[in-house]
């Protein structure tokens, strides 16, 4: 069995299918790990959702910020909707309710075999197992009766740092922001949400979340996406896979067993290495 971890798809369904074919993926024996942001900005979010859902247990996807945005507008309507999203086809689909219900069941974090898959990252003070427990708190709300209320309170940049005594919507918001939006943070874990450039553009006293010298999760390989300006980055304890397909760059897969890289350019297949 091979596991192929794939970066942010964001509705780039044609490139996604080309990449899956290039990998030689066999759904009867292999698995896809998808780092979230299945939807939005690209042209084929509906086809992407339908295909991933059809794979059943052969695909594991975590939730990204764009997936959560889809849930929000599905339940809250036009309030807070961005003018240039590409999600109307999903919202008008005959199987919309089934797809949205399925999306609500996806995990915020997946932990398996020394790997932790999460869309954006983990705060420097979090280790993998406790972080998984925090993710379950959010998952329980998303799949339960409080989902709509939570989605109404989910957006926001504060609090910017984790505290164990946080409660209610603030607690859940910090967990979601760390796992789906974070790029840079301070040594004490205060997140910065405006800076979206490459690592060398970090604001003063900020580092990429994975570069903190005392990162508590350094014994776990984090598989993530979200940061297209970072691009493909492979370190002993990091696989960052957002290589900017929706921006005209590449969609990337890495086979976990040997770290072989497979890539498809937006519009052209690149091959593997």
UniProtKB/Swiss-Prot annotation:
CDD domains: MPP_ApaH (cd07422)
Catalytic activity annotation: P(1),P(4)-bis(5'-adenosyl) tetraphosphate + H2O = 2 ADP + 2 H(+)
Keywords: Hydrolase
Disulfide bridge map: none
Enzyme kind, highest EC tier: hydrolase
MF terms (GO), sorted A to Z: bis(5'-nucleosyl)-tetraphosphatase (symmetrical) activity
Pfam families referenced in this protein's UniProt entry, alphabetically: Metallophos (PF00149)
EC number(s) stated in the UniProt entry for this protein: 3.6.1.41
InterPro entries found in the cross-reference section: ApaH (IPR004617), Calcineurin-like_PHP_ApaH (IPR004843), Metallo-depent_PP-like (IPR029052)
Keyword Ribonucleoprotein: no
NCBIfam families referenced in this protein's UniProt entry, alphabetically: apaH (TIGR00668), PRK00166.1 (NF001204)
The family this protein is said to belong to: Belongs to the Ap4A hydrolase family.
Biological function: Hydrolyzes diadenosine 5',5'''-P1,P4-tetraphosphate to yield ADP.
Entry protein name: Bis(5'-nucleosyl)-tetraphosphatase, symmetrical
Organism from which the protein derives: Aromatoleum aromaticum (strain DSM 19018 / LMG 30748 / EbN1)
């Amino acid at each position: 069995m091979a596991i192929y971890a794939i970066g942010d798809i964001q509705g780039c369904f044609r490139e996604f299918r080309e990449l899956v074919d290039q990998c030689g993926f066999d759904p009867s024996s292999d698995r896809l790990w998808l780092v979230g942001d299945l939807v939005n900005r690209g042209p084929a979010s509906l086809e992407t959702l339908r295909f991933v859902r059809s794979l059943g247990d052969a695909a594991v996807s975590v939730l990204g910020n764009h997936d959560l945005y889809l849930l929000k507008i599905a339940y809250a309507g036009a309030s807070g909707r961005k003018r240039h999203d590409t999600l109307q086809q999903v919202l008008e689909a005959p199987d919309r309710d089934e797809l949205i219900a399925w999306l609500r069941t996806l995990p915020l974090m997946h932990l398996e075999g020394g790997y932790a898959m999460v869309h954006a990252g983990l705060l420097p003070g979090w280790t993998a197992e406790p972080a998984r427990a925090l993710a379950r708190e959010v998952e329980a709300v998303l799949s339960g009766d409080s989902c709509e209320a939570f989605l109404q309170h989910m957006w926001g940049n504060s609090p910017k740092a984790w505290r164990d005594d946080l409660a209610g919507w603030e607690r859940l918001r910090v967990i979601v922001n760390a796992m789906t939006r974070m790029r840079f943070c301070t040594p004490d874990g205060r997140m910065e949400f405006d800076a979206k450039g490459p690592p060398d553009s970090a604001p003063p006293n900020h580092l990429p979340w994975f570069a903190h010298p005392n990162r508590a999760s350094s014994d776990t390989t984090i598989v993530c996406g979200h940061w297209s300006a970072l691009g493909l980055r492979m370190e002993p304890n990091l696989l960052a896979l957002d290589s900017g397909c929706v921006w005209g760059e590449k969609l990337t897969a890495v086979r976990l067993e040997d770290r072989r890289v497979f890539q498809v350019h937006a519009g052209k297949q690149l091959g593997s290495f």
